[in-house]
């Protein structure tokens, strides 16, 4: 992992979050929509482009593949992907903490 890996795009963040358990493309989009109350809707191009990039970076891996259908694959976050996700979560928590401090100081 390098410093240029962070910050994650919103799509990467939610895809990694949805892959804490094995999941396929449609399942990922459904979970992301549910998590965000519909605010984030991943189109097929965005989703599969992001999946390809995450696979290339080693942040996710193919978990299972339907031998009868070349399209049905499940993916899972890797240990490296989990590390990247945890670093991003720490970064976001720090941002929120600083924002809360600013609000407290203004009161």
Task: Locate the predicted segments by residue.
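Amphipathic alpha-helical dimerization/coiled-coil segments
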Residues: 83-107
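Basic, amphipathic "hinge/linker" alpha-helix immediately C-terminal to the N-terminal HTH DNA-binding motif
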Residues: 70-89
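N-terminal helix-turn-helix DNA-binding core of bacterial DNA-binding proteins
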Residues: 5-46
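Beta-hairpin "wing" of winged helix-turn-helix
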Residues: 55-71, 76
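Basic amphipathic alpha-helical segments that dock to polyanions
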Residues: 47-48, 54
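A cross-family signal for key residues in well-ordered alpha-helices
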Residues: 16-17, 30, 52, 86, ...
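Short, intrinsically disordered or compositionally biased N-terminal tails of bacterial proteins
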Residues: 1-3
């Amino acid at each position: 992992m390098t410093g240029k890996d962070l910050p994650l795009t919103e799509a990467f963040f939610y895809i990694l979050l949805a892959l804490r358990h094995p999941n396929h493309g449609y399942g990922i989009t459904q979970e992301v929509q549910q998590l965000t109350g519909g605010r984030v809707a991943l189109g097929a191009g965005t989703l599969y482009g992001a999946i390809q990039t995450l696979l290339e970076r080693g942040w996710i891996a193919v978990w299972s593949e339907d031998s009868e259908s070349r399209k049905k694959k499940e993916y899972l976050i890797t240990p490296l992907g989990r590390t990247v996700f945890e670093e991003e979560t720490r970064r976001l928590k720090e941002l929120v903490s600083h924002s809360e401090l600013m609000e407290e100081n203004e009161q």
